[in-house]
């Protein structure tokens, strides 16, 4: 409906004393969200208008005027508009149909799937058994959930050195200490987090989580959760969002421990090549003679200095918006050359970690049974983080800039906080209805949901997944992150 003058006045107030432009078309260049992508900002803004009883508004977006069409922007989330009109939200693109892939080897390289020769041979075998070529969705999905990132094939594999088979895998060596001396460790190396025995503590929570209610204090037997994981590839390619989603991912892992638990505080560690700090005139800001031992490389995406600044900003930004402080961390810069061999953190290391707690009642996952419902909580699906599992499993720079940028997730701490509020409410209840819970991250729905029903199997109706971008293909729906 056409807004009334009162509604226009309320909107002008809401937008910070803005004025209504009485025009059908705005001239000039603008940077704004892609038309097929409803932003988290829009979701929150529309909800505010609904709470103000301003009905009929389905989308609100921000567009920023820029000087030219060459202005910097994030092509994954934004696009350049030469003028803005009434059709700014109109999408005329249809989803790509499911395709049969005739050349596995070529498709593997084009899509950045990082499939090995053995894996391609296995897929050829499946083609013969099925009597047809595999689809792009099947191959893409297999590459994500079978990637090194998701399956730890190197760490869990058997090593043969100088013709001799080693007694243990790297993973078993890591687990050995805990197996022989568990002490207070209750769960490790088999869930999203590790849990150790905690003290009896007071829980201060609403008596009824479904409505406004008084708070009450209860004694609960607690467990302490610990988690750390690297987010190296995304931070090398796009440091702000790479580090932000690193922090966000390890927070989700603590939320998804057992059948739900609470994050408390985080840490972030950064390792890069020498930053070679410069002042505004391009001269060395600090005397660092040792940084000159190796020539400066032509960096693929960002310099070490840019990575340290942007990654630190990204990790802190997510923690601040979510409500988890980063309370400690470390920085290491290193380069070395010896006997013609060069060593440096050209592919950076970003380690996100944290501590949390939960109820001892909830530290073990249950086994889903027939009839249990699969529930997906959080934001809608968009063309973001495609192929992150497979692309992050190989050397950065192996694939094109487009593939690697597409594989980096984008942060949405506000939506994650909403999902956390639900998890917290369920865990604080006297009865937690959750049987098993996993976080949705690398390799998308296919990896998350297959882990969820790993022991029993399950049926997922793809049409019921929360799809925000109606132009997503089947491949993109099952694998977006």
Regions found by a protein language model. Give the residues of each.
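Anionic-ligand anchoring segments at beta-strand to alpha-helix junctions in alpha/beta enzyme folds, i.e.
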Residues: 453-475
